[in-house]
């Protein structure tokens, strides 16, 4: 069997990794060995943070709802409990949006929640 030289495949693989590492600082964008490690680590961070992003946004929404609810004289937990008892099903993302951009509508929701408690 003839000897197979893998220069073409190696070159293609190196080019692919270096293309992914474009914009990285120093050797991370120029040296294959370092770039490969940087790309792998970047992928791990991206995977982890796609999941963390969901938690962080939920935390942000809850903080905004809590602040707006307290301005209207109700804590977050009592507000959410009141909404559930009043059969108002609005998710936290929309509630946070209403709290930030439409304070009057949020005040109405707080009153309904208070009434249901």
Swiss-Prot record:
InterPro entries cross-referenced by the UniProt entry: Ribosomal_bL20, RIBOSOMAL_L20_CS, Ribosomal_protein_bL20_C
GO biological process, alphabetically ordered: ribosomal large subunit assembly; translation
A single cellular component GO annotation: ribonucleoprotein complex
Regions annotated as coiled coil: none
GO terms, molecular function: rRNA binding; structural constituent of ribosome
This protein's record includes keyword RNA-binding: yes
SUPFAM superfamilies reported for this sequence: Ribosomal protein L20
Stored PROSITE patterns: RIBOSOMAL_L20
Pfam assignment, any one: Ribosomal_L20
Keywords annotated in UniProt: Ribonucleoprotein, Ribosomal protein, RNA-binding, rRNA-binding
This protein's record includes keyword Ribosomal protein: yes
Family the UniProt entry places it in: Belongs to the bacterial ribosomal protein bL20 family.
Role summary: Binds directly to 23S ribosomal RNA and is necessary for the in vitro assembly process of the 50S ribosomal subunit. It is not involved in the protein synthesizing functions of that subunit.
Protein known as: Large ribosomal subunit protein bL20
The species this protein was found in: Vibrio cholerae serotype O1 (strain ATCC 39541 / Classical Ogawa 395 / O395)
């Amino acid at each position: 069997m003839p000897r197979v030289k893998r220069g073409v495949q190696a070159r293609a693989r190196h080019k692919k990794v270096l293309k992914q590492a474009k914009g990285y600082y120093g050797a991370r964008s120029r040296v294959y060995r370092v770039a490969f490690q940087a790309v792998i680590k970047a992928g791990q961070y991206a995977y982890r943070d796609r999941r963390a992003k969901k938690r962080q946004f939920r935390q942000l929404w809850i903080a905004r709802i809590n602040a707006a609810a307290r301005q209207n004289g109700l804590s977050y937990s009592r507000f959410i409990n009141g909404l559930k008892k009043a059969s108002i099903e609005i998710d936290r993302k929309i509630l946070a949006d209403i709290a930030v951009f439409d304070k009057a509508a949020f005040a109405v929701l707080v009153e309904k929640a208070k009434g249901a408690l």
